[in-house]
C-alpha cells in the first residue's frame, strides 16, 4: 500500500540522516529497489556501506555479500583482466534495471590493506553497448578501488 511505502521511505531516510549519511537527492519509492523512480547517490551508498563495515550490529550484512569470481551474482564477475587481480578480494551487491541501469556496491578486501567501500552506478547505458561490456567496465573501476592497475 502506498501509505506504507511512504512511511517506510521516510523511516529509512530518517535512519540514514540520524547516522550522518548524506541523503540529499535520495528518493526511496519502494523497499525493493525495483522502481525506476528510486534514486540514490554513490555517496549515500558508500557512506551506508562504511556504516555497515564499522557497526558490529550490521557486520552480518557485509558478510552476506557474494565474492567476486566465487559466489552468487558475483560468480562470473572479475574473471578478465584488468579486474581479475581483484578476484576473491571484492564482496559486493550487483543491481540492474534493464535496459539502461547497472550498479555494483560493496567492499574491497585485502589482508594487507584496510577494506574500502565503493559504489559504481551506471545510468543511461547506451542501447548499443552490451551488458557484458558495462559489467566489465564497472568491474575495472572496482578493481582500481582495490588497488589493481592496468
What are these regions (language model features)?
Residues 29-31, 64-69, 94-95, 108, ...:
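Active-site-proximal beta-strand/loop segments in catalytic clefts of secreted hydrolases
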Residues 42, 71-76:
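Large, well-folded core regions of big proteins
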Residues 61-72, 137:
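Active/binding-pocket-proximal capping segment
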